Regions:
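Terminal accessory carbohydrate-recognition/targeting modules of carbohydrate-active enzymes
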Residues: 1-280, 626, 630, 634, ...
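Generic structural signal for well-ordered, non-membrane alpha-helices
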Residues: 232, 381, 385, 412, ...
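Active-site acid/base region of carbohydrate-active enzymes
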Residues: 163-169, 175-188, 274, 279-297, ...
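A glycine-rich phosphate-binding loop feature that marks nucleotide/adenosyl-phosphate handling sites
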Residues: 471, 495-497, 652-654, 687-695
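Short, mixed-charge aromatic SLiMs
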Residues: 350-359, 409-416, 474-478, 597-608, ...
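Substrate-binding groove/exosite segments of carbohydrate-active enzymes
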Residues: 207-215, 266-392, 397-400, 427, ...
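Active-site core of glycosidic bond-cleaving carbohydrate-active enzymes
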Residues: 318-342, 346-353, 405, 430-432, ...
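Short secondary-structure capping/junction motifs at helix and strand boundaries
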Residues: 118-123, 244, 341-342, 394-404
């Protein structure tokens, strides 16, 4: 276990976001100390303080001597909270924010330090703007935002807010009496400007104004002797049920502050000791990996009445996705977070059964339990893949048994939307019209049949195992036959008939709109999910038009009722066959090289590069045996580390999309285990299969405390005179470790296995 937790300091911080979370509550504000109103799914509303499925506050702003304190001079990001430092005349103020791990409450602790050798007295205040409102898609539930009311008890140091149309409530408790309370309704709405923009400045919302909020100021005084420091603590609690419960949440945090804060620190110290990385000469990659260990905890959310699970990201996606889960779980499993992985899948299954009832897995569900879209075709086999991964790490058949029937029904649904063995429908790219027989949809169905055959075999269901094995082999052959384009040397984006592709390509020449998921377009915020993904630059738009004209020309050359594979946008889905190990070695290298050459010549970027795509590329390089490229892509991923928020990588490289994205661990953590060491855990058989992809440039790498079957395993790589050596520490002699090394490969590493009976 590491001796202390890391921190990242930003001097003269900007209004870029930060995140502070617990399982029940989270805070998104600006690193300069303010709370700008930003968001897409709910315009202007995705930042602030949230207690899903409701928002509590737009934010709070510190005042000093009847004026806004201004921007922070320093911002410090810690795994369990964050600090803002304000250096002002005679005093220094440190603002520390953290959220309780499991309670619906957070703390704002203000330490005032007298920097002089004489007594000082300062007047301080906190401006607080409530915004008790429901989360995205609440309109479908009939929930409407009401006007907030606020009251204050100065002696008790307490302020309370309630939505007048709903039981939603919030309470703030200060650990000492307050001097004064003032409503700021007039200054908030009268001039069109508010004392609550970034770092306390008046804020222009470009015409946006929520009339249901309530803005107030609570004042207090700091009397300090020479060199003295004094702490003022404010505890915020919320509830979807009552003011009483909100007060109880805040009060419990105040009463147990030291214990709960220490508990949170210890939790993150312990997290840092599980599946920890050491990579000689690569401090950025080490740091990025370590912070992603903490992010894996930040994305865990529990909502009474809905469920618990890992959410996709902040600020735009603090809820659940079928697709994202498939890429988030692997790194969590490395850290031993099996329970939350299972709960996430149970949550998705419950929602899917309620909405679909046929094994189809949902795509997206808001944290109020409302499902936005019933599911991409890819997400059903991905769910089965998740179940199988958990079994591989845990080895317990009970969860496999629990999920088996649902997964089997899901693959039956896949068959119901299939044509000649392969399914039609939307995949991960979300471009309107990309719904014929798509590459990612088809190959993930192949993967679904493969994992179902393995599941059935593990459970002793031999007939099912044989049936799914036959379908796996048959669909792989169909996929290769239908999608492989000899002229390019790799698999196409989509297989379609002549008329299908012509009408789509005519539309794609002009725009790449996200597909119309639901007819309920009138719901506020849903339009943001239908953005045009067309290239922004005119030259790229011209390339798109020329590409589609070529597609139309090819289509017109085919027979009217025949179909063929088309390379459309260079989506990169061709690599999935390599990622799963269906194409390996020399053949994989040739396929990846051909795809890269085509992209350089023909392709345009319809969106920014995602770290997820880089992670998937590393999986492919593992099977194509190109370790130098793995190292290159790892370093490329590291270039986006901290571009927006210290400690995090963004959804889209380097600084776009969600500033904290759960599935980025597929690029920042998972490749060390699954690609470099190439570990394939088989916990049920107490066996590890190693299929490493290494090169001398990697130097020394260690991955210690990886949790498999509830016990720690450690992996060490080094090189001596160019030859690799892999040492594996196993917790018991009952485990077997087998090294797989293809004959065509040079430089087979030495494998050393040691029993190290350390307790988890």
């Amino acid at each position: 276990m590491p001796e202390k937790l890391p921190e990242i300091v930003r001097n003269q911080p900007e209004d870029k976001p930060y995140l502070v979370t617990g399982r029940r509550i989270y805070v998104i504000g600006a690193q300069d100390g303010g709370f700008p109103q930003r968001g897409e799914h709910m315009p202007h509303e995705m930042w602030g303080i949230w207690l899903p499925p409701i928002k509590l506050f737009n934010g709070f702003w510190l005042w000093l001597e009847d004026d806004w304190i201004g921007k922070a001079d320093r911002f410090v990001m810690e795994p369990f909270g964050c600090r803002f430092v304000y250096e002002r005349k005679e005093i220094e103020l440190e603002r520390f924010q953290w959220a309780a791990h499991t309670r619906g409450a957070m703390a704002l602790e203000l330490t005032v330090r007298n920097l002089t050798q004489a007594p000082v007295q300062k007047s301080l205040a906190l401006v607080i703007e409530s915004n008790l409102m429901p989360v995205w898609l609440s309109e479908r539930m009939g929930r409407k935002d009401g006007k907030d009311s606020v009251s204050c008890d100065l002696e008790k140091g307490l302020a309370a807010w309630k939505d007048q149309e709903n039981p939603w409530s919030a309470v703030m408790i200060c650990d000492q009496p307050l001097d004064a309370f003032e409503l700021l309704e007039e200054s908030r709405t009268g001039s069109g400007q508010r004392p609550c923009g970034s770092a306390g400045k008046a804020c222009d919302r470009q015409g946006y104004k929520n009339e249901n909020t309530s803005c107030c100021k609570v004042s207090f005084s700091a009397r300090l002797a020479a060199g003295e420091s004094k702490r003022f603590s404010f505890f915020f609690g919320g509830s979807v049920c009552s003011r009483q419960e909100a007060g109880e949440q805040a009060g419990a945090l105040m009463e147990n502050r030291q214990e709960l804060l220490e508990e949170k620190r210890e939790r993150y110290l312990e997290l840092g000791g599980r599946a920890s990385l050491s990579f000689a000469g690569e401090p950025v990659l080490e740091q990025m990996y370590r912070w992603n260990q903490f992010i894996n905890d930040w994305i865990q959310c529990e909502i009474p009445g809905v469920g618990e699970g890992v959410v996709a990201g902040y600020a735009e996606f603090p809820w659940w996705f079928g697709n994202d889960t498939n890429y988030i779980l692997p790194a969590l499993l490395m850290q031993g977070e099996v329970a939350i992985c299972k709960e996430t899948l149970r949550l998705l299954r419950r929602a899917s059964l309620k909405v679909n009832g046929n094994g189809r897995v949902i795509h997206e569900m808001s944290n109020n339990g409302v499902v936005f879209y019933e599911g991409m075709t890819t997400e059903t086999p991905q769910f089965a893949d998740c179940v199988w991964q958990i079994y591989c790490f845990e080895g317990d058949e009970s969860f496999l048994e629990e999920m088996y029937d649902f997964c089997r029904e899901g693959m039956r649904w896949i068959e119901s939307v299939s044509e000649e063995g392969l399914p039609r429908g939307y995949g991960i790219s979300e471009v309107a019209g990309l719904d014929c027989m798509c590459c990612d949809v088809a190959i993930l169905a192949v993967r679904g049949y493969e994992v179902m055959s393995k599941m059935a075999k593990a459970l002793g269901r031999e007939a099912d195992a044989s049936c799914f094995e036959e379908k796996f082999c048959a669909t792989w052959e169909i996929f290769h036959r239908e999608f492989f384009i000899p002229e390019t040397g790799f698999y196409g984006d989509m297989v379609a008939g002549r008329e299908e592709i012509i009408k789509r390509a005519e539309s794609w020449k002009h725009s790449l709109k996200s597909f119309p998921i639901t007819p309920e377009d009138e719901i506020v915020g849903e339009a943001s999910c239908k953005q045009d993904k067309s290239p922004r630059e005119s030259k790229e738009k011209e390339r798109l038009c020329r590409r589609m004209e070529n597609v139309i020309r090819l289509a017109k050359e085919t027979e009217p009722k025949s179909r063929r594979a088309y390379q459309l946008f260079g989506l990169g889905h061709s690599t999935i066959a390599v990622e799963f190990g269906y194409v390996t070695g020399k053949q994989a290298r040739e396929l990846l090289a051909a795809q890269e050459q085509w992209r350089e010549k023909e392709c345009f970027q319809i969106d920014g590069i995602m770290p997820l795509a880089l992670g998937r590329r590393m999986q492919a390089y593992g099977y194509s045996r190109e370790p130098e490229k793995i190292l290159q892509v790892l370093r490329q991923t590291g270039e986006g580390f901290g571009a927006v928020m210290p400690g995090a990588t963004s959804e889209i490289y380097p600084d776009r999309g969600c500033f904290v994205q759960g599935w980025n661990s597929f690029a920042t953590m998972w490749p060390y285990f699954s690609v470099i060491f190439g570990v394939r855990p088989r916990a049920g058989q107490k066996e590890l299969i190693l299929q490493p992809c290494i090169c001398p440039d990697m130097g020394k790498i260690s991955l210690t405390g990886v949790m498999i079957a509830g016990r720690p395993f450690s992996f060490f790589l080094d090189f001596e005179e160019g030859r690799g050596r892999i040492r594996v520490e196993i917790p018991s002699a009952q485990w077997r470790v087998n090294l797989v090394w293809e004959e065509e490969q040079d430089g087979k590493p030495e494998l050393v296995v040691e029993v190290c009976d350390a307790k988890a």
